[in-house]
Each structure stands twice: as C-alpha cells, then as structure tokens.
Amino acid sequence: MRKILYIHGMGGGADSRIPSILQECISNPVVVRTYDFDPEIAAVQIASWVNEVRPALIIAESLGSLHALRLEGLPIIFVSPALNAPYYFRFLSWTTFLPVMTPLLDRIYKPRSGDRQQLHFTFRVLRKYRRHRIEAMKTVRNTSYENQVFAFFGTDDHYRKQGVVSIKTWKKHFGDTFSVYKGTHFMEEEYVRSILVDKVLEVLDNNK
C-alpha cells in the first residue's frame, strides 16, 4: 500500500496531532518521525526516510515545508507553509548573543511532552536556516510542480501577520494552488477530517 510521509513543523514530532487524525481517516500508512531542529542534520534524516519509505505523497506542516521543497519528484500538500521563517530566525540569531535569550527562547517555544523535536535556539543553528531556504528555493526553480503542490492557509494564522507564513510568497512561486480555511496556523480537527483528507485522497488518486 502506498505510504504518506508527514514532515512536522517546529516542535512537532512522531506523536503530532494532524498525522494521527489523518491515520484515523485513511487506510494508507502515514509515516511521521521526529527530525532534528538543525536543518542540516534534518535534511539528511528526511532524505534517508524518503529513500526508506518510498512515499507516494509528502505532507508538510509549517516549518517542515522548506524540508519538503528540498525533495524532488513527489507531490506535496502543505499546511500553513512557513516559507519565510528563516528571515525571522535571522533576526533571532543575533539576539542570542545576549546571554538571557537562548534560555528564554527555549522556554517560550518549549514543545509539549512526548516524542517531539527538541528546540535549542543558538546562533549556530538559527543562522543555518538562511542556507536552508536558499537550497529549498533553488530546488523550486529547477523543478516543475505542475499539479504536484497544494497549500492550505488559515484565515486567523498569527504567523501570517508576522510574514512567516505568506500567501503572497506562495503565489510568487506556485500561483493559485492554495485554499484558505477559517481557522488558525494549527489546522483544526474539523478541517483535517474534511478538506485535508479530501485533498490527500484526490492527490493519491491522481498519482496512481
């Protein structure tokens, strides 16, 4: 049976909410694993999982979207793609020279307990996200995404106000291949069970 690889967002992990709901709704196995916050390490991890799992579809949430864009040849569904997060991280990276900032950021963004990505906001790690975005956009320029990508954005996504999540940025690269739901950055269960499940089944059916 064809598998789905789910790439979680910042602080997510193997027990993230959306993939667990998806698995209740569809018969295809949904594979989700916890990757490192360091994007260089994570890129290697995710590439190896793609080779192992051989997914028919990638679903990428929030910060995981940049990792998905570095992959080629697979259809991708995006949930609240945070394509501009590296710009925000660039600013945060300089603040970490203040001794209080790294422990403060670690506390503010501390993930829930469980099998979750461990977050440690150091200058070294945050600065790597600039190169990470460059590599993702390089792949975008060299790849034809016709009928291969689709994104969902929430009307009340607080990261859209900061520009971290941006419909304008999405349209620049992928046109009108998106839909907006009346919800937040973290897609609510009712939308996972309706619009996301419907899109997953549609993409799988179109890519047999």
Residue ranges and their predicted role:
Residues 58-68:
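Gly/Ala-rich beta-loop-alpha elbow adjacent to hydrolase catalytic centers
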Residues 71-72:
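Aromatic pocket-lining residues of Rossmann-like dinucleotide-binding sites
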Residues 2-53, 185:
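Active-site catalytic motif of lipid deacylating hydrolases and related acyltransferases
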Residues 6-10, 59, 152-154:
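Short hydrophobic segments within beta-strands
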Residues 1-3, 146-147:
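A short, charged/proline- and glycine-enriched loop
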Residues 56-59, 75-77:
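Residue in the alpha/beta-hydrolase core beta-strand immediately N-terminal to the catalytic nucleophile
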Residues 75-77, 81-207:
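The alpha/beta-hydrolase serine catalytic core
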Residues 15, 19, 23, 68, ...:
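Short, highly selective alpha-helical patches that border small-molecule cofactor pockets
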